Every structure is written in structure tokens, then in C-alpha cells.
Amino acid sequence: MSIMEYNGGSCVAMAGKNCVAIASDLRLGVQSISLTNNFPKVFAMGDKTYLGLTGLATDVQTLYELFRYKVNLYKFREERQIQPKTFANLVSSTLYEKRFGPYFSFPVVAGVSNDNTPFICGFDSIGCIDFAEDFIVSGTATEQLYGMCESVYEPNLEPDDLFETISQALLNAQDRDCISGWGCVVYVITADKCIKRLVKGRQD
């Protein structure tokens, strides 16, 4: 068993037309034992910048607190919100600092820049950035998510269509992964707002 699969969980981000969406499942478990169905893995790092964390649950919480601290310091120093690409570089350097004893997490960053350009990227556990223009997947349902996203994704989707696409991709992928599931949370980020929706899924 890989330590990355100890708690389970999956995350996906998609880029649309001047918008992005990021979603994660809500399950927290220890292998096949489910503990809760209210453990979201997506966190706000700014008005239009979001972070998804999959992997070992303790490292998910540790990294969230660490990035929250660093982003707050950035706001105090710069007196502005952090941009998605800047935050991605912050994530990369933070993970690389621990390259000899890495965090057991594969983060995903999604956001909309000041010029309304959608931005998504993923990372490995030591901070190598994987930039993408369509979608990024992470977690134990990675293979299933790749198949679903390649089937249903289309470029330049409007926010409502992007929500439907990412929801269907994640719900169908997590149904085929026994340590992800129990519904999902979806954030759709546009230039002027962020919409959060909870999507019900199978509870078995």
C-alpha cells in the first residue's frame, strides 16, 4: 500500500472561458474504513485563487495551515491578493524545501488572473509544476479521472457548462474508486465571483 492511498481522496481542476473550476470529493477514511463524509480538500487562498490537496490527511491539514500563513504574510507585505501563478511558485518552492523528506500530497492550484486568464496547474510531492490548459487531476481516482475528463471536457466552456462537466467527471470517476467518494464540493471561479456548490453522490 502506498502512503498516498492511506486516506483516499481525489481532486480535479478544469479551465473554461475566462473561468476555472476545482472540485474534490468529501470522504475521509483509513483504507476501506470511512470516517467522515465532510472532509473537503479545496481551500481558498485568495479571492480568485484556490488550492486542492490530496494525499495523507495529516499532511493536507499541515500544508493548508502553512500556505494560509504564507499567503497572509504576502498580503501584509504586498498589500494585494496573491495571483494564481505567484501562488503556484510559492507552493513549488515550499514543497521543494522538504525534498529529502517530502509531504505526502499532490497539490492542485486553480484560479483566474487579474487579466481574466484561467490558470490551473498540478505538482508532484517535491514541487515540480505541471502546467495545463485543459484539466489537472490528483488523488487515488487519477486514472479514472483522466478517462472521464478526456471524454467530457471541451475547451472554452461557460461557467455553468464547466460546473456540469467537472461534476460529472468527478462523480463518475469516484464511483470507480473505493477510497474516494461520498459526494463532492465544486468551486467555479470567474472574474467577479466564486460559486460553491455541494453535489450529492453515492453514500456507499
From Swiss-Prot:
Is Cytoplasm a UniProt keyword of this protein? yes
Q: Which PROSITE patterns match?
A: PROTEASOME_BETA_1, PROTEASOME_BETA_2
Where, per UniProt, does this protein localize? Cytoplasm; Nucleus
Concerning SUPFAM superfamilies, the annotation shows: N-terminal nucleophile aminohydrolases (Ntn hydrolases)
Record GO biological process: proteasome-mediated ubiquitin-dependent protein catabolic process
Superkingdom per UniProt = Eukaryota
Q: Name one GO cellular component term.
A: proteasome core complex, beta-subunit complex
Question: Which keywords are on file for this protein?
Answer: Cytoplasm, Nucleus, Proteasome
- Does the UniProt entry include the keyword Endoplasmic reticulum? no
InterPro entries listed in its UniProt record: Ntn_hydrolases_N (IPR029055), Proteasome_beta_3 (IPR033811), Proteasome_bsu_CS (IPR016050), Proteasome_sua/b (IPR001353), Proteasome_suB-type (IPR023333)
What does the sequence similarity comment in the record state about its family? Belongs to the peptidase T1B family.
Record's function text: Non-catalytic component of the proteasome, a multicatalytic proteinase complex which is characterized by its ability to cleave peptides with Arg, Phe, Tyr, Leu, and Glu adjacent to the leaving group at neutral or slightly basic pH. The proteasome has an ATP-dependent proteolytic activity.
Q: How does it assemble?
A: The 26S proteasome consists of a 20S proteasome core and two 19S regulatory subunits. The 20S proteasome core is composed of 28 subunits that are arranged in four stacked rings, resulting in a barrel-shaped structure. The two end rings are each formed by seven alpha subunits, and the two central rings are each formed by seven beta subunits. The catalytic chamber with the active sites is on the inside of the barrel.
| The protein's name | Probable proteasome subunit beta type-3
Organism encoding this protein = Schizosaccharomyces pombe (strain 972 / ATCC 24843)
